Amino acid sequence: MDCDICHRSHDAKRLPFLCTVDARAALYDGRIENVMALIENEDLQKQISDLLDETNAPTKDRKDALQAQQRTAEDRTTQILAAADKLRNDIKAAKEEIQTRRAALSRRKSDIAAVSDGLIERRVKRQKSVERETGMHKYRWTKCADELARTRSFLCIEAAQLYGLKRIKEGSPSKYEYYLGGIPVVDLTAMNSSTPEMISTSLSHICQILILVSHYLSIRLPAAITLPHRDYPRPTIFNLSASYRPGDPVFPSQASVSSPSSTTDTESQRVSRPRPLFIDKPLSQLAKEDPATFSYFIEGVTLLAYNIAWACNTQGVSIGDKALFEDMSNMGRNLYNLLINHQSAGKDPDTLKNEADGQTSRFGQYSHGTTFYHLGGAEGTEFSKTFKLPSPMKLADKLKKKLLSEAPTPDWEVLDDDAWKVEEELADGSQVNKNLLMGDKSSPRRGTSGWMRVKNR
């Protein structure tokens, strides 16, 4: 309430008494409390007076009600006392548990303090011990890998010598001829001048030694090679997409005799058909008479050269310029460098860079058969990215164009006996007319018989 004299609201703590209104306002709460106490006192006096004024004895119902109230009060008091006792016991147990935990925590702190003394030194010592053991294991693994690489190198050299792989210098100082099994290694760019028997035999020898070497080196060639076996006595090779697929492959002889009912998926069989590594006819004649077989054969020999180049790169053997078709298709030189001359073969700049970084890629290290230097691991994958070979299909197209452009054009065309029937009939008819005009009674002469004629240019 506002003061009528000073016109301000009353605040008992912050504002002092300046007038009677402020004093009255300060006493207002106390007066209210006094009035309430007086009213309560009057009520109690009235109750006492009523009890004293009762002259009659209490009735039975009144006694029963009072006894019931007494029993209720006693029961409630008992419950309250039991709850109080239970609460005291809980408090006592909690205090004991707190004391036990404090004692355990104190012991743990003392133990931690005792253990923490010299913890850093022990940790450093343990770390050095683990690093030393790890280094020893790595050294042993590296030593075993080096011994395995030397063993692989020895096996490859021995296999090459047993197969008769050698290099013979030709007329020019930089030209070499490579022999395997006593016959020259086929030159892909000069197959037009080679006989079918020599080409097939040379490719068969290359397949056999390449499979043996891949077994020694524990590497999986990109294009799967199938050696002669019971179902098919000729070597074949699969393209990159169809290699190492589950299921039985369809060889050319099996595809020719298979019935349409047994062929469930023609497209899958076409994809999984192996490429032949043999020919029965001269290459120029095969290209003219059977272009499909010619294309399959060119693709097969290109895949074989691709396998050799890929094996050289995985073993750190240089093949020259990977972009040049001549370096990729030179199977004799690449095979000789891989098996015999791999220790002294020239290294490409990527290999020299790896050696400068301390990561040498020596012969026989990387393979698919060991976890150390595994070609499928992270380190092997990074190593595989250092060399990038051109696609075998592009190489096959280049080889096909080169062979077709260099195919010899014959000056003589071989004809069978049926081709001369028309000319003989024409010659006989002209001779009969001539005899009739001349009146010659002798038997007519037949035309000159032969088996070839000059081809018109």
From Swiss-Prot:
Pfam families: ATG14 (PF10186)
Gene Ontology biological process terms from the UniProt entry: autophagy; protein transport; SNARE complex assembly
Disruption phenotype: Significantly decreases the radial growth of colonies under nutrient-rich conditions. Strongly reduces conidiation. Causes only mild infection in point-inoculated spikelets of flowering wheat heads and impairs the spreading to nearby spikelets.
Subcellular location: Preautophagosomal structure membrane; Vacuole membrane
Key words, A-Z: Autophagy, Coiled coil, Membrane, Protein transport, Transport, Vacuole
GO molecular function annotations of the record: SNARE binding
Subunit structure: Component of the autophagy-specific VPS34 PI3-kinase complex I.
Annotated family: Belongs to the ATG14 family.
Protein name: Autophagy-related protein 14
Source species of the chain: Gibberella zeae (strain ATCC MYA-4620 / CBS 123657 / FGSC 9075 / NRRL 31084 / PH-1) (Wheat head blight fungus)
Higher taxonomy: Eukaryota, Fungi, Dikarya, Ascomycota, Pezizomycotina
